[in-house]
Amino acid sequence: MARFFRRRKFCRFTAEGVQEIDYKDVATLKNYITEAGKIVPSRITGTSAKYQRQLARAIKRSRYLALLPYTDKHQ
């Protein structure tokens, strides 16, 4: 029976030495929301707890300022 080996998840923000996640950096934030507009959990992305909190706060701020949509297209 074949086993599947998954790559170990790591926090990209820790690896890059990011101090604070900026809410104006929409390109980075888009990688951490789904097509439906939900915030992707850290168990999927591998983001550490510290940066997951900053990420959620930044996404919510950018949504409030209309830099990111709350959902995708309403139809």
UniProtKB/Swiss-Prot annotation:
CC annotations in GO: cytosolic small ribosomal subunit
GO BP: translation
Domain of life: Bacteria
GO MF annotation terms: small ribosomal subunit rRNA binding; structural constituent of ribosome
InterPro entries: Ribosomal_bS18, Ribosomal_bS18_CS, Ribosomal_bS18_sf
Swiss-Prot/TrEMBL keywords: Ribonucleoprotein, Ribosomal protein, RNA-binding, rRNA-binding
Keyword Ribonucleoprotein appears in the UniProt entry: yes
SUBUNIT field: Part of the 30S ribosomal subunit. Forms a tight heterodimer with protein bS6.
Family the entry assigns: Belongs to the bacterial ribosomal protein bS18 family.
NCBIfam families listed in its UniProt record: S18
Role: Binds as a heterodimer with protein bS6 to the central domain of the 16S rRNA, where it helps stabilize the platform of the 30S subunit.
Stated name of the protein: Small ribosomal subunit protein bS18
